[in-house]
Amino acid sequence: KPWERL
């Protein structure tokens, strides 16, 4: 998921 790239 895009927000899991943090």
From Swiss-Prot:
Coiled coil: none
Sequence similarity: Belongs to the frog skin active peptide (FSAP) family. Tryptophillin subfamily.
Organism from which the protein derives: Pithecopus azureus
GO cellular component, one term: extracellular region
GO biological process per UniProt: defense response
Signal peptide extent: none
Domain of life, per lineage: Eukaryota
Protein name from the UniProt record: Tryptophyllin-T2-7
